[in-house]
């Protein structure tokens, strides 16, 4: 069973990147968010602030049993999770600063923007079994940020370091 995790990022949105890339699905999207229990590139929980084409917060569980790299799973295995309770996120414009925080305990996830809860729900028992570090994801968004994360209680040692390269 995964331990509780909490991650917070304070960021300033600077606008789109100079060069934009489509997602693996072919969709053009600008977004930024948090990874939780990131076992690897194929098995993790996302709390994503979609900037364009539509401003909203989306929580997804990406699960691909037996796959561990982006080359193995691509953009397969995503399941968007419906919240028990949700509220709108502000539309991001260049120059704005905000705080995005996610707290996951067992299969329950809470997401906050500027200390206001914007998403609360159950991500499922599959997500609760994932074990790995927190991180960030950014697609076509230019940001400056500070990431804060507490070491989960009861953990020893370090997780695998992030690697540069193509993501999905």
Placement of each model-derived feature along the sequence:
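Hydrophobic residues embedded in beta-strands of well-ordered beta-sheets
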Residues: 55-58, 109, 143
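Activation corresponds to long, low-complexity, non-globular regions
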Residues: 157-168
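Carbohydrate-binding surfaces in secreted/extracellular proteins
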Residues: 9-11, 92-126
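Short, aromatic/His-centered strand-loop micro-motif at the edge of beta-sheets
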Residues: 67-99
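Flexible glycan-contacting loops in extracellular carbohydrate-active proteins
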Residues: 121-149
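Secretory/extracellular carbohydrate-interaction modules
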Residues: 1-74
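Surface-exposed loop/edge segments in extracytoplasmic proteins
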Residues: 43-44, 116-121, 158
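Surface-exposed coil/turn segments at beta-strand junctions on protein surfaces, enriched
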Residues: 2-4, 27, 91-95, 129
């Amino acid at each position: 069973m995964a331990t509780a995790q909490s991650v917070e990022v304070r960021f300033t949105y600077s606008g789109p990147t100079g060069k934009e890339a489509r997602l693996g699905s072919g969709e053009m999207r600008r977004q930024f968010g948090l990874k939780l229990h990131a076992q690897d590139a194929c098995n993790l929980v996302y709390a994503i602030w979609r900037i364009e084409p539509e401003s909203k917060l989306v929580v997804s569980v990406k699960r691909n049993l037996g796959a561990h790299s982006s080359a193995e799973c691509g953009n397969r295995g995503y399941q968007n999770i419906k919240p028990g309770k949700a509220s709108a996120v502000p539309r991001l414009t260049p120059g704005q600063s905000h705080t995005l925080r996610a707290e996951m305990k067992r299969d329950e996830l809470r997401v906050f923007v500027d200390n206001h809860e914007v998403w609360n729900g159950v991500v499922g028992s599959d997500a609760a079994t994932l074990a790995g570090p927190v991180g960030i994801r950014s697609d076509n968004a230019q940001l400056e940020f500070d990431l804060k994360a507490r070491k989960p209680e009861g953990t020893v040692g370090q997780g695998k370091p992030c690697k540069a390269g193509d993501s999905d």
